[in-house]
Amino acid sequence: MLQSNEYFSGKVKSIGFTSSSTGRASVGVMVEGEYLFSTAEPEEMTVISGALNVLLPEATEWQVYQAGQVFNVPGHSEFHLQVAEPTSYLCRYL
Protein backbone atom coordinates (compact mmCIF):
# COMPACT_ATOMS: atom_id res chain seq x y z
CA MET A 1 0.00 0.00 0.00
CA LEU A 2 1.30 3.44 -0.92
CA GLN A 3 0.81 6.40 1.42
CA SER A 4 1.07 9.96 0.07
CA ASN A 5 2.34 12.67 2.43
CA GLU A 6 2.62 16.43 2.04
CA TYR A 7 4.51 18.82 4.35
CA PHE A 8 5.30 22.53 4.53
CA SER A 9 2.35 23.70 2.40
CA GLY A 10 3.19 21.25 -0.39
CA LYS A 11 6.89 22.10 -0.63
CA VAL A 12 7.82 18.56 0.46
CA LYS A 13 5.94 15.53 -0.88
CA SER A 14 6.63 11.86 -0.32
CA ILE A 15 5.20 8.43 -0.96
CA GLY A 16 5.57 5.85 1.80
CA PHE A 17 5.94 2.15 1.06
CA THR A 18 7.28 -1.13 2.46
CA SER A 19 9.41 -3.58 0.48
CA SER A 20 11.55 -6.61 1.21
CA SER A 21 14.73 -4.83 0.06
CA THR A 22 14.35 -1.49 1.87
CA GLY A 23 11.89 -2.22 4.66
CA ARG A 24 9.61 0.68 5.60
CA ALA A 25 10.60 3.76 3.62
CA SER A 26 9.47 6.83 1.73
CA VAL A 27 10.70 8.49 -1.43
CA GLY A 28 10.09 12.16 -1.99
CA VAL A 29 10.98 15.55 -3.40
CA MET A 30 11.69 18.88 -1.68
CA VAL A 31 11.67 22.25 -3.42
CA GLU A 32 13.83 25.19 -2.40
CA GLY A 33 13.45 26.22 1.24
CA GLU A 34 14.49 25.61 4.84
CA TYR A 35 12.85 22.84 6.81
CA LEU A 36 12.88 21.41 10.34
CA PHE A 37 11.96 17.73 10.60
CA SER A 38 11.30 15.63 13.71
CA THR A 39 11.96 11.89 13.86
CA ALA A 40 10.08 9.27 15.87
CA GLU A 41 12.58 6.54 15.03
CA PRO A 42 16.09 6.44 13.50
CA GLU A 43 16.19 7.32 9.80
CA GLU A 44 18.66 6.75 6.98
CA MET A 45 18.43 9.46 4.31
CA THR A 46 19.87 8.96 0.82
CA VAL A 47 20.00 11.91 -1.58
CA ILE A 48 18.88 10.69 -5.01
CA SER A 49 19.28 13.93 -6.98
CA GLY A 50 20.17 17.48 -6.04
CA ALA A 51 21.72 18.24 -2.66
CA LEU A 52 20.76 18.79 0.98
CA ASN A 53 22.55 21.10 3.39
CA VAL A 54 22.00 19.36 6.75
CA LEU A 55 22.38 20.34 10.39
CA LEU A 56 22.12 17.11 12.37
CA PRO A 57 21.24 16.91 16.07
CA GLU A 58 24.22 17.76 18.28
CA ALA A 59 26.11 19.15 15.24
CA THR A 60 27.46 22.69 15.21
CA GLU A 61 28.23 22.89 11.48
CA TRP A 62 26.10 22.32 8.40
CA GLN A 63 27.18 19.57 5.99
CA VAL A 64 26.23 19.21 2.33
CA TYR A 65 25.11 15.80 1.04
CA GLN A 66 25.09 15.32 -2.74
CA ALA A 67 23.35 12.72 -4.91
CA GLY A 68 24.32 9.22 -3.79
CA GLN A 69 25.39 10.28 -0.30
CA VAL A 70 23.76 9.01 2.90
CA PHE A 71 23.29 10.43 6.39
CA ASN A 72 21.65 9.03 9.52
CA VAL A 73 19.37 10.79 11.98
CA PRO A 74 18.73 9.45 15.50
CA GLY A 75 15.20 8.70 16.63
CA HIS A 76 13.31 11.21 18.78
CA SER A 77 15.33 14.14 17.44
CA GLU A 78 15.12 17.10 15.07
CA PHE A 79 17.26 18.02 12.08
CA HIS A 80 17.41 21.09 9.83
CA LEU A 81 17.59 21.08 6.03
CA GLN A 82 18.41 23.83 3.55
CA VAL A 83 17.43 23.02 -0.03
CA ALA A 84 18.78 25.21 -2.86
CA GLU A 85 17.27 23.27 -5.79
CA PRO A 86 14.56 20.61 -6.14
CA THR A 87 16.01 17.51 -4.47
CA SER A 88 14.80 13.91 -4.31
CA TYR A 89 15.52 11.51 -1.48
CA LEU A 90 14.93 8.04 -0.06
CA CYS A 91 14.21 7.83 3.66
CA ARG A 92 14.49 4.40 5.33
CA TYR A 93 12.97 4.00 8.78
CA LEU A 94 15.38 1.88 10.82
UniProtKB/Swiss-Prot annotation:
One of its GO terms (cellular component) is cytosol. Its EC number is 2.4.2.1, 2.4.2.2. InterPro entries: Ppnp, RmlC-like_jellyroll, RmlC_Cupin_sf. Keywords: Glycosyltransferase, Transferase. It comes from the Bacteria. It holds the Pfam family Ppnp. PANTHER family: PYRIMIDINE/PURINE NUCLEOSIDE PHOSPHORYLASE, PYRIMIDINE_PURINE NUCLEOSIDE PHOSPHORYLASE. Belongs to the nucleoside phosphorylase PpnP family. Catalyzes the phosphorolysis of diverse nucleosides, yielding D-ribose 1-phosphate and the respective free bases. Can use uridine, adenosine, guanosine, cytidine, thymidine, inosine and xanthosine as substrates. Also catalyzes the reverse reactions. This is Pyrimidine/purine nucleoside phosphorylase. The gene is ppnP.
